[in-house]
């Protein structure tokens, strides 16, 4: 199979979908890899590294799309890429369709096969291709929250961990999954007063067992959230429903009840966000303020630490990419239940329920396209 890896062109997206080591593994399996020139530079990989691994370099994104049977990316195609995608071309990347109707309609119209990293799901309901970036984003959410809590960035002026004789900041984490767990580890390790809210009592018991004493757990309901946001210094939105729009758990009317200078970090922004006031931002302009509350809603947070993120992502995605290349997408999906759940849009059909529900589109069972 001919594999193409374009350079990411989303704002400040410095990750690349394939490392030189990953390219070498694909070539070793008998396939051809074409990298767009300088695609790996943001992650510290030179074109020469890819050539030494057996890949070929093409100067433009147009040439990569034109020659490839499968495109491997990090983030969803943006509007300028829509016209480059061919009928029957496989796209393997993060799509987050449920938060982007124009993207969904474009992919339905071009006849492509869209395999979304974020909905590849194991039998135990874990999401192996989302976990690495959730780990990165969860840890980064506390770094960013602590930074914007500083007065020079408009925050309340509180040191996250406090000092002897002065209490630490209060951190509220909504959602106890991978993002929430990693955020709690970071905030707890820095000495903050942390509360994790989740709907699953089983998950809360687990978190209560593994977290230090300064990390507490609480059942998620509107009353508890409404009360907790009033005194929080940093609020992390970490709620996920795989492939579907995130629920809006912090509503517009809660914002004025918060302290001026409170920092809200919505890690769920890729799926529409779990704050009603969320609007996607970029690394160039990461924050906005509503009622004196700072909102950080960058949709590609791990893009700011591309070396770590690229290595972590390729470790997870490469085995699946090789399966698709070796067997073709149909056979690979038929033989791998987890990969089959990654199919979202196939040749003009929506085959993932969450995407269909998000836009009121007809849903077809994935078996009809295999």
Model segments located where?
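Adenosine-phosphate binding glycine-rich loop
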Residues: 118-159, 269, 274-370
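Short glycine-/small-residue-rich Rossmann-like dinucleotide-binding loops
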Residues: 69, 75-76, 95-96, 221, ...
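Rossmann-like adenosine-cofactor binding region
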Residues: 209-292
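An N-terminal-biased, well-structured beta-alpha scaffold segment characteristic
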Residues: 2-110
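Glycine/serine-rich phosphate-binding loop and adjoining beta1-alpha1 elements at the start
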Residues: 2, 8, 77-169, 298-300
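Glycine-rich phosphate/diphosphate-binding loop of Rossmann-like nucleotide-binding domains
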Residues: 6-42, 152-240, 287
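Hydrophobic beta-strand scaffold residues
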Residues: 33, 57, 91, 114-115, ...
């Amino acid at each position: 199979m001919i594999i193409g890896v374009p350079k990411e062109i989303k704002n400040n997206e410095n990750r690349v979908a394939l490392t030189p080591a990953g390219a070498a593994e694909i070539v070793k399996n008998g396939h051809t890899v074409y990298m767009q020139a300088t695609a790996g530079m943001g992650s510290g990989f030179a074109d020469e590294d890819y050539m030494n691994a057996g890949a070929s370099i093409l100067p433009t994104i147009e040439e990569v799309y034109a020659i490839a049977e499968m495109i491997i990316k990090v983030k969803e195609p943006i509007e300028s890429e829509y016209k480059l995608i061919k009928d029957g071309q496989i796209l393997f990347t993060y799509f987050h369709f449920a938060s982007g109707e124009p993207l969904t309609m474009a992919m339905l119209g071009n006849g492509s096969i869209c395999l979304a990293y974020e909905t590849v799901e194991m039998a135990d309901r874990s999401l192996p291709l989302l976990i690495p970036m959730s780990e990165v984003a969860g840890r980064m959410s506390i770094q960013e929250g602590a930074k914007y809590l500083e007065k020079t960035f408009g925050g309340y002026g509180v040191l996250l961990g406090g000092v002897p004789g002065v209490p630490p900041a209060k951190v509220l984490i909504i959602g106890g999954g991978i993002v929430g767990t990693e955020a709690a580890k970071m905030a707890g390790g820095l000495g903050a007063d942390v509360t994790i809210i989740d709907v699953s009592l089983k998950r809360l018991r687990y978190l209560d067992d593994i977290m230090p004493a300064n990390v507490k757990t609480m059942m998620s309901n509107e009353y508890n959230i409404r009360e907790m946001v009033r005194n929080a210094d940093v609020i992390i939105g970490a709620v996920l429903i795989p492939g579907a729009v995130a629920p809006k758990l912090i509503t517009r009317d809660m914002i004025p009840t918060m302290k001026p200078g409170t920092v809200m970090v919505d890690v769920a922004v890729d799926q529409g966000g779990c704050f009603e006031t969320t609007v996607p931002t970029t690394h160039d302009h990461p924050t906005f303020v509503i009622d004196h509350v700072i909102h950080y809603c960058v949709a590609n947070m791990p893009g700011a630490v591309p070396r770590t993120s690229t290595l972590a992502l390729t470790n997870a995605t490469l085995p699946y990419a090789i399966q698709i290349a070796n067997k073709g997408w149909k056979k690979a999906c038929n033989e791998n239940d987890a990969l089959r759940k990654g199919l979202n849009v196939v040749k003009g059909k929506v085959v993932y329920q969450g995407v269909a529900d998000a836009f009121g589109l007809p849903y077809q069972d994935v078996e009809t396209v295999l």
